[in-house]
Amino acid sequence: MEETNQFKAIDSRFVYISISSIEAIKEFVSTVTNFACDATLCSGRYIVDAKSIMGVFSLDATKPIKMVLEVGRNGVDDRDALCDAIDKFIVD
């Protein structure tokens, strides 16, 4: 009987973003929801879905926020396109 590996290696990428106003948060979430990849925001001990406006509003926006990007469940890898679309929010 041959064993199969049920777990796939996760290819994660991350960038830091700055979204310091209500309008910026609305624009950011609206843009991110148009992409298939999974996007998570990490700030301190909090982790939220970047496609959730309520989740994003709950984070401390006074500091850069780490955004982790992974290929979506459908297998579409549009992470580079997402980074291009949110370029104005990305900080070094």
Located regions from the model:
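Generic non-transmembrane alpha-helical segments
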Residues: 27-35, 85, 89
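C-terminal structural segments of small proteins and small subunits
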Residues: 64-92
